[in-house]
Structure formats: structure tokens, C-alpha cells
């Protein structure tokens, strides 16, 4: 019976079984590599981003060939001495097995988990992708799965590489010895493909077919021939059609002029303290790729939609948004979407308001409700979120306002706050997170912070990083939220600095920020170090301990407690003191060396001297390497469903 099942299982595997990793010797090696991926019709641009865990700028394309080229960091695994890069894959259907579903999705670029588990919709699978690092003769190596008809000569011509190079890298002795499904490494001197224009994500719809053909579901050969034979009538049709187009353009110009005139008169003459805005009432706010169409260039009014004029505080008027403008909703829409702000829709309370679940224009959203006295924080969050867009940052959709209240509308992040999944999760109806999931969440949050610190046109500090401001989506991927305290960082000759009054949450505040009010990216890194300690220990940022000689309990920062513990844990082989502070909900299902590395990284992040703290780029690299090691550890526990599910069952 077992043999029959095994043979049946093998028969289901795709034809990409010949993909093999590239061997390596230097386990400290880290390089940039590319993966050539040809998506199927169900894999949109946003799906590809998620599958490979990359940003849009990390993807180039060869549109004519139908290929995307994904840039990934590649490293040498310490156990197998093979080059790989990691990602996660969310299974969509309860069909087949994890192995063949994963291999098929990545078209042979993946080295999936060695498991015979059945695929389960919603399950998150850790996947190793096959990559390579150049020996120094070329700038990059690109992983490419051979297709039917490929040859060394055709690949040489397509990618502008000599045949000798391809043969040398892949050890090809026979030019005809290339089989469809083989994994090849293409040496490159420059980035392949061209930058992918986001406007190509949703191509325009094709012209409609004639009604008679649509009724039958196709266009017959007779219809095609009839069209071809009617060439003598084309000039007359062109003339009539041209006149129709000109007339339509004239009508459109008149409508545009009317719209522009009405917008120039939109300022309130009756109230000198306010501005009048046109409010969209019926338009949707989701684009075809599934992302939120939140902040858009130009005016946010729609000529074919019902409009309403409302008064909005002058601080939110002209000049608040430099380029992009968020969508604006009516108070009535917000009130109806949240079921009149019912307690059953309440998601939680933040520093500056309450957050409610809402169903707005048939889409799930989160709505932050603030008093009008919080205009400064409201404006700060709107301005930042209209400039930063990243898969690990919560997306802004729009806002609404009345004389007394302000409302910010965000994407709804289904699993809620990380805090609820770390601190006594069972009492909140949550299942404890596994080690792999905690590692991935830490990396996601680090990437979001790295983005606002390093990769935006103007750099920002968040100033309120904590586990309640890190949200988890349905796949348990992390997104940073609540930018009400975010601050622009100015570059000076002595580095970056932003002088401000001290704001934030006790337990996460860096020493220099508390004493001098100097907010820098290193302030965020200190707070992130505290988050890492919470992820390891499952404890809150401030712990109540029994004070000696007094009746009142003492409140101590988690960072100071963990630093004291680490003094008695010099390495991963002698970490008995540290193990006492590891979250018992993980039930000892974690690699001790990886946990010790994250604890050490957290220790570096909370160093009293901000100069000695790593930057977020270094933190991301460290967490990526730790996750790779954790995945190797996970592979040794292939039969343990508690590890692979991402959640720890039981207890």
C-alpha cells in the first residue's frame, strides 16, 4: 500500500525534477542574483511580488518573451554548501500535494520542502529558491529553467552572452544536451530586461467583437472574409467615424472646462477657516491587480460620480499633499460602513483614536476615528502614507472629516496586532506562533522599517515601533502601521537628526531620545530591538515584577531584563538562563542557535550608544540569514506538522 502511494505521488510531480542547486564553499558569501520566471495567466504582477517576496523595483521584464527577472539576495547554506535564497508561498487550494504544487508554481526554480503533505488552502510554506553567485568573472548569475526548443546558441543570442560562458558555468560538454526542465545558470554583466511599467499590469480591454459574433461566442471565418472584402467601403466609414470622434472630443473638452472651473471655485466663501472638497460617493477604490488605489496623482473628483461638498479644516487643504491625493469619503459612508461605530466593530484603541472594522463600498477596511484636535497627527500620517508604498507597510485608502472628527481609512489587516499573538494569545482566541513564523514576521517588519529609513525619496523615522503597531495579514505576514508620529529626518554634516518633543511608548524609547529628544533612525532600531525580545520571550515591553521590601510591584523594561539574562548566556551552547525567558508557547520547537542569534541581534539594537547599533539594512541581512538557517532546521523536522503549519497547536 505504501509503495503504491509513493509511486502515485511521484507520478504527480512536475517535469522540473532536474533542477539542482549550485554548490558553494564560502558560507559567508552573499550576492545579488536573478531568477528568470515565466508566469502563467493566473499569476499577476502583485502575485509574483508576493511569491518571491520582492519590491516592484526588484523586477525587470522581457515583455516580448513573457519573462520576469526577479532580483534576490543569494547566500551559501552552511549545512548543504549550496546557493539558495528563501521566500514563502501561500497555498490557494486544497488540491494536490505541497511538493508538486510548490514546484509547479515556481516553474522549477524552487527547492521545496521534502514532504508528502497534502496541500491545504491558506497554509504558508517556506520555500528555497535556486540561485547562484558569480566567481568574479561576471557581475551576476541568473537561474533559468530550460524550455522546449532552447539551445546554448539560442540562449546566447537571447541574453547577449557568449556560448563559451554558458558552457563553462553549467559544465555543458554536448551543445545538444539541454533538456526542457533543466536548471541553467546564465552569466550576466548587467541587469537583464527592462524596468517593468506598472501601467502594464492592467492592459486595456480589447475592442468588443460584433454583437452577432458575441452571441455565438466566436468569430467565424466567413465574418473575417466579409470584413476583408469590404475594403471599398472603408474610406466612407473612416470619414463618418472621424467626424464622430471629433464631436466626442469637443464634448469632452467642454466637460473638462466645466470641471476645472468648478474646482477653481471650490474654496468656501462663507467660512474662511475651511475648504470645500468634492467627495466621491459611488466609485470603487481597488485596481485590477488587487492593490488599493488609494493615493493618486491629480484631482480626486470623478465627473461621472455623484458628488457632495463638505467642509474640511483648512490645515488639510491646499499644499498638504504635494503630488498624490488620497480618496475622500463622506461621513455617512464611514458611519454606515462601521455599523454606526458599533462596539462589535471596534478593533482596538490607539494613541490618538479608536480603530473600527468597516465594509466600505463592498470592501473590508479599517477606520481610525480621531477628534478634530488631532489634526497634526492626522496630517502627518496622511502625508507619509501618500508617499510610501511597500508590502510591509499598511496601505492608506483615504479619509473623511467633519467639523468635530477625522477619519483615516486603511486596508484591513485580518489577523490584527502582533501583540495579540505574543502575549497570552490563547486568552484572545489566537494560536501561538511557531518559530519560523516569528522569524518571518521579524524580517517583514524589518523590511518595512528599512524602506522608510533607506529607500524613500525623503527618509522618515516612525517613532512608535511596537508590537501593537505591527499587524499581521491572513498569511501572517507583517505590516507596520500607525504613522501618526512619523517624522521627516533631515541630513546634516554630522548625520541624520530630527529634534522633537519626546513621544512614543514607554519601554520602547531609546535613552538618547528620552534625554535629548533627538529622534533618528537609530531610535526606531532601539524600539525594534525591544520587539525582537518580545518575539523571543512572549513578554510585554514593560514587565511588572515583585519589588523587594515594598508592597507595590515594580515596572521594569523588558530590554534591561533580557540584557541581564544574556550576560549569563555567552553562547548558544550555554544559554540555560536565556531558555528560562523563551516563550513557553513554542514548546521548545525552535533551533537554539538561531534563537540565540536573534537575541544577540536584539542586544545590538538596544545598545545605549546609538552609533553601535546596526542600521536596518544590516538587520534585514542578519534576519534573512537566520531565517535561511531556520528553514534548514525545519527540513530536519519534516514530519512535524506543528512546525510546518506556522502555528503551534496544543497546550
From Swiss-Prot:
Its main location: membrane. Pfam families: LysM (PF01476), PK_Tyr_Ser-Thr (PF07714). This is LysM domain receptor-like kinase 3. The modification Phosphothreonine is found at residues 330, 500, 505. It comes from Arabidopsis thaliana (Mouse-ear cress). The active site is at 464 (proton acceptor). Putative Lysin motif (LysM) receptor kinase that may recognize microbe-derived N-acetylglucosamine (NAG)-containing ligands. GO terms for cellular component: plasma membrane.
Amino acid at each position: 500500500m505504501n509503495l503504491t502511494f509513493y509511486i502515485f505521488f511521484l507520478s504527480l510531480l512536475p517535469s522540473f525534477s532536474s533542477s539542482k542547486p549550485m554548490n558553494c564553499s564560502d558560507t559567508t558569501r552573499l550576492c545579488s542574483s536573478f531568477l528568470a520566471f515565466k508566469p502563467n495567466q493566473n499569476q499577476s504582477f502583485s502575485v509574483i511580488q508576493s511569491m518571491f517576496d520582492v519590491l516592484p523595483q526588484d523586477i525587470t521584464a522581457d515583455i516580448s518573451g513573457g519573462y520576469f527577472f526577479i532580483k534576490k539576495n543569494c547566500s551559501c547554506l552552511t549545512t548543504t554548501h549550496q546557493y539558495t535564497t528563501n521566500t514563502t508561498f501561500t497555498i490557494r487550494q486544497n488540491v494536490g500535494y505541497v511538493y508538486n504544487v510548490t514546484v509547479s508554481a515556481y516553474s522549477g526554480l524552487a527547492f521545496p520542502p521534502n514532504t508528502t503533505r497534502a496541500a491545504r488552502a491558506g497554509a504558508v510554506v517556506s520555500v528555497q529558491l535556486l540561485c547562484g553567485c558569480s566567481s568574479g568573472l561576471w557581475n551576476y548569475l541568473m537561474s533559468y529553467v530550460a524550455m522546449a526548443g532552447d539551445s546554448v546558441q539560442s540562449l546566447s543570442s537571447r541574453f547577449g552572452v557568449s556560448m563559451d560562458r554558458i558552457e563553462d558555468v553549467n559544465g555543458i560538454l554536448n551543445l545538444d544536451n539541454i533538456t526542457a526542465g533543466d536548471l541553467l545558470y546564465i552569466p550576466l554583466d548587467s541587469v537583464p530586461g527592462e524596468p517593468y511599467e506598472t501601467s502594464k499590469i492592467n492592459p486595456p480591454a480589447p475592442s468588443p467583437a460584433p454583437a452577432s459574433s458575441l452571441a455565438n461566442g466566436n468569430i467565424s471565418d466567413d465574418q473575417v472574409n466579409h470584413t476583408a472584402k469590404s475594403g471599398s467601403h472603408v474610406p466612407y466609414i473612416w470619414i463618418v467615424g472621424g467626424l464622430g470622434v471629433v464631436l466626442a472630443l469637443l464634448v469632452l473638452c467642454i466637460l473638462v472646462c466645466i470641471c476645472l472651473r468648478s474646482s477653481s471655485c471650490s474654496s468656501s466663501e462663507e467660512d474662511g477657516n475651511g475648504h470645500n472638497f468634492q467627495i466621491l460617493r459611488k466609485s470603487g477604490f481597488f485596481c485590477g491587480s488587487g492593490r488599493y488605489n488609494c493615493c493618486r496623482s491629480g484631482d480626486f473628483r470623478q465627473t461621472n460620480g455623484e458628488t457632495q461638498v463638505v467642509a474640511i479644516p483648512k490645515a488639510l487643504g491646499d499644499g498638504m499633499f504635494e503630488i498624490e491625493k488620497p480618496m475622500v469619503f463622506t461621513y455617512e459612508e464611514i458611519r454606515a460602513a462601521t455599523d454606526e461605530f458599533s462596539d462589535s466593530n471596534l478593533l482596538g484603541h490607539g494613541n490618538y483614536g479608536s480603530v473600527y472594522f468597516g465594509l466600505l463600498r463592498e470592501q473590508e477596511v479599517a477606520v481610525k476615528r480621531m477628534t478634530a484636535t488631532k489634526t497634526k497627527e492626522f496630517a502627518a500620517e496622511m502625508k507619509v502614507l501618500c508617499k510610501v508604498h511597500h508590502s510591509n507597510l499598511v496601505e492608506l485608502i483615504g479619509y473623511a472629516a467633519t467639523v468635530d472628527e477625522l477619519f483615516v481609512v486603511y486596508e484591513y489587516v485580518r489577523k490584527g496586532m502582533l501583540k495579540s499573538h505574543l502575549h497570552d494569545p490563547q486568552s484572545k482566541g489566537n494560536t501561538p506562533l511557531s518559530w519560523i513564523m516569528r522569524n518571518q514576521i521579524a524580517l517583514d517588519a524589518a523590511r518595512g522599517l528599512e524602506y522608510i529609513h533607506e529607500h524613500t525619496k525623503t527618509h522618515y523615522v516612525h517613532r512608535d515601533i511596537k508590537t501593537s503597531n505591527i499587524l499581521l495579514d491572513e498569511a501572517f505576514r507583517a505590516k507596520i502601521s500607525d504613522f501618526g508620529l512619523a517624522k521627516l529626518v533631515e541630513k546634516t554634516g554630522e548625520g541624520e537628526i530630527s529634534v522633537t518633543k519626546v513621544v512614543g511608548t514607554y519601554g520602547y524609547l531609546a535613552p538618547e531620545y528620552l534625554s535629548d529628544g533627538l529622534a533618528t533612525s537609530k531610535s526606531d532600531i532601539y524600539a525594534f530591538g525591544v520587539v525582537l525580545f518580545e518575539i523571543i520571550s512572549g513578554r510585554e515591553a514593560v514587565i511588572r515584577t515583585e519589588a523587594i521590601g515594598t508592597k507595590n510591584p515594580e515596572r521594569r523594561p523588558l530590554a534591561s531584563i533580557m540584557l541581564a539574562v544574556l550576560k549569563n548566556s555567552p553562547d548558544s551552547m550555554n544559554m540555560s538562563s536565556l531558555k528560562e525567558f523563551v516563550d513557553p508557547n513554542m514548546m521548545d520547537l525552535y533551533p537554539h542557535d538561531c534563537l540565540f542569534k536573534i537575541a544577540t541581534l536584539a542586544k545590538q539594537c538596544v545598545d545605549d550608544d546609538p552609533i553601535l547599533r546596526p542600521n536596518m539594512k544590516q538587520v534585514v541581512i542578519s534576519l534573512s540569514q537566520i531565517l535561511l538557517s531556520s528553514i534548514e532546521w525545519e527540513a530536519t523536522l519534516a514530519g512535524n506538522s506543528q512546525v510546518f503549519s506556522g502555528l503551534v497547536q496544543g497546550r
